[in-house]
Design a protein with these regions (language model features):
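Short N-terminal signal/transit or membrane-insertion segments
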Residues: 2-17, 123-139
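Intrinsic disorder/low-complexity detector
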Residues: 2-106, 148-149, 154-228, 272-315
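A short linear-motif detector with a strong N-terminal bias
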Residues: 50-56, 112-113, 133-138, 171-176, ...
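Short, well-structured alpha-helical patches and their helix-loop capping segments
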Residues: 109, 113, 144-150
């Protein structure tokens, strides 16, 4: 019941109790990793109707008709996650060497939030009775007004396939576009799942780097900041290692459609009347794990002959 309804005297305690019970039920479902009941009911109503929703372009939709793929509905998964307390490295003095450490609290927060969002996306797809979700997109956010919280939002289009699902009977998620997905199927491969990984590293610069990045020495000739370079490599390799481990767990033979996104934040630290600039490096890696499915299908190209001005004949 809304605030104006209360002012007008509409509704009652029974309605308030029902709303409170519904909220508590949804909170319990979310805490268990599921989706709110209203979202589940919306999906079931969409499936029961005759119309579908999708993020497909006109060309992509036309391709579904040619490939006997039926779009079902758009599905979504999200997770807003509070990051736990994270201890930052602290150098012992101006003359200390460089140090590099993974911020495990932040790394784990990103990976867990994304896993929860993908799980909810897959649950919506299951309620829709779909076999796969294509064109899965990720939106990773950190809000200025919630500095210790992150949000992961994933969207995709649930589709029904002529061959059904795989051995797991669960919808397969892929960030491939529909045309890429169709081409992959024709080549004798199938996606076995989305692979996603994040790593966050903290880099304390060495004495040499501090000299080159503070005070008058900023005007020195071009030089590589090798400890910062090493930190970026370490963060990338850590994220790639996790992604590769996920692919192996899915029984994949490779990863396609991979995207690598990275952010670098500067953190100023004052110590012993000196100021240094530390780096926080974040890598997000996303891709689709694939495996062979059998013999490839020929692409069967069409031949078009131009017989005159503006005339086209299809054999």
């Amino acid at each position: 019941m809304g605030f104006l309804d209360r002012l007008k005297g509409l509704g009652g305690d029974d309605e308030d109790d029902a709303e409170q019970q519904a909220r508590e039920r949804d909170i319990a479902r979310i805490e268990s990793g599921s989706i709110p009941l209203a979202a589940e009911q919306r999906i079931r109503e969409l499936v029961a109707g005759t119309a579908f929703t999708s993020g497909l372009s006109v060309a992509d939709f036309a391709l579904t008709r040619l490939e006997q793929i039926r779009p079902v509905c758009q599905v979504m998964g999200t997770s807003v996650y509070k990051v736990g307390w994270q201890n930052y490295p602290w150098s012992s003095g101006w003359g200390s060497d460089a140090s590099l450490i993974e911020l495990t609290a932040l790394t784990n927060a990103w990976n867990d939030a994304r896993a929860r969002a993908l799980g909810r996306l897959a649950e919506e797809a299951s309620h829709a009775g779909s076999h796969a979700v294509v064109d899965v997109t990720f939106d990773n956010r950190r809000h200025e007004f919630l500095s210790d919280e992150i949000e992961v939002l994933v969207n995709g289009t649930a589709v029904h396939l002529p061959e059904g699902t795989g051995a797991s009977n669960a919808p397969v998620l892929t960030d491939l576009s529909l045309p890429d997905y169709v081409l992959l199927r024709r080549a004798g491969y199938v996606p076995v799942g989305v692979v996603a990984s994040t790593s966050v590293f903290y880099i304390v610069p060495s004495r040499q780097t501090r000299r080159m990045t503070t005070g008058w020495q900023r005007t020195q000739p071009n030089q590589e900041l090798t400890d910062f370079t090493q930190g970026v490599y370490e963060a990338r390799e850590s994220a790639l290692g996790r992604a590769s481990a996920q692919a192996r767990a899915l029984g994949a033979g490779g990863l396609v459609g991979m995207s690598v996104e990275h952010h670098v934040a500067v953190r100023e630290v004052e110590q012993n009347n000196q100021t240094r600039e530390d780096l926080i490096v974040t890598f997000h890696i996303i891709g689709t794990a694939i495996a062979p499915s059998g013999e490839h299908r020929p692409l069967d190209p069409q031949t078009i002959l131009r017989l005159g001005l503006g005339a086209t004949k299809r054999p």
